[in-house]
């Protein structure tokens, strides 16, 4: 896609291809603490070269469109679960699926200093959700890397007293959402497993009052193509997709990511990376002209 750069006023400005926010650029072997988000870790797994060029060299890749409808469904689901959180009752979908022993986790209230240096009270679940400045945080071992991620929700298993990682997903597919097929033959659905594992890994490192469950869930809402038409409303199916948490592999992969950014050598690209393939072909044409 073509992405045109605008300033905060919505006016078109020159795109340099470089990140002007120097604090977002990592210097190999720097001593100062540096935050790496769950999405950046996902980029490392997808293509180490693109990840390195963004984080260390400061290249700014074209942006992706914001999916406002997906954001809206997330917001509405959070409102539903927050109402259940206040009274510590299971959500209607949990009751429907025979999971009455699970309730939205009430982590309490904390105080946060905002950008205006004002102290404000926040629900802790909202701190964990706010990925830009807060979120779940864990400093990786004895390094300067702070791992970070904004989670959609956390539930509590009242029987085992364990916390459950939850992420909301919105889609529109003619196929029925099913536990048996959801993770089959889909690269990006498979990446959701890593997302859940990563959140659980962070929570384990945060030493919370409860242990972290090996059970996690995707709350998938799927827009339905109904015969009667639009009529100013969209109907959704709702499905809980279960994932058994695995975090043992993350120590090695995170350390590999840190070793990569502490090296002066730019890593090889993923051979399936379309961004790298486009960059190579564009470079040839820009340098030599049309070679076909």
For the regions a language model picked out, list residue spans one by one.
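Amphipathic alpha-helical segments that form well-ordered structural scaffolds
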Residues: 80-83, 198, 202, 256
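Metal-dependent nuclease catalytic cores that hydrolyze phosphodiester bonds in DNA/RNA
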Residues: 1-159, 288
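Mg2+/Mn2+-dependent nuclease catalytic core
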Residues: 130-252
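Serine-centered coil/turn micro-motif
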Residues: 64, 186-190, 272-276
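Short catalytic/ligand-binding loop motif for oxyanion handling, primarily in non-cytosolic enzymes
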Residues: 52-53, 60-62, 172-176, 224-228, ...
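Metal-dependent nuclease catalytic regions and adjoining charged, substrate-binding loops involved
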Residues: 2-19, 27-29, 36, 202-292
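Short amphipathic alpha-helical segments and their helix-coil junctions
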Residues: 30-32, 61, 173-180, 252-258
């Amino acid at each position: 896609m073509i992405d045109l750069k605008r300033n905060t006023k919505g006016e078109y400005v020159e795109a340099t291809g470089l990140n002007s926010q120097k604090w977002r650029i990592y210097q190999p072997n720097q001593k100062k603490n540096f935050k790496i988000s769950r999405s950046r870790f996902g980029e490392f797994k997808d293509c180490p070269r693109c990840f390195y060029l963004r984080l260390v060299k400061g290249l700014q890749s074209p942006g992706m469109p914001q999916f406002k409808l997906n954001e809206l469904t997330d917001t509405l689901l959070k409102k539903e679960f927050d109402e259940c959180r206040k009274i510590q009752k299971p959500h209607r979908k949990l009751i429907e699926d025979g999971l009455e022993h699970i309730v939205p986790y009430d982590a309490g209230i904390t105080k946060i200093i905002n950008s205006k240096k004002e102290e404000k009270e926040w629900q802790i679940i909202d701190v964990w959700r706010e990925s830009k400045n807060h979120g779940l945080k864990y400093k990786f071992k004895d390094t300067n890397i702070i791992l970070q991620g904004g989670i959609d929700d956390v539930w509590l298993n009242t029987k085992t007293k364990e916390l459950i990682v939850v992420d909301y997903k919105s889609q529109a597919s003619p196929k029925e959402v099913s536990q048996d097929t959801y993770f089959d033959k889909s690269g990006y659905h498979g990446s959701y497993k890593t997302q859940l594992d990563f959140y659980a890994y962070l929570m384990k490192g945060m030493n919370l009052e409860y242990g972290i469950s090996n059970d996690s869930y995707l709350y998938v809402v799927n827009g339905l193509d109904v015969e009667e038409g639009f009529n100013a409303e969209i109907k959704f199916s709702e499905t809980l997709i279960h994932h058994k948490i695995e975090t043992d592999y993350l120590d090695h992969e995170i350390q590999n990511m840190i070793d990569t950014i502490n090296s002066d050598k730019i890593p090889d690209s993923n051979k399936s990376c379309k961004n790298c393939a486009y960059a190579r072909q564009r470079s040839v044409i820009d340098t030599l002209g049309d070679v076909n």
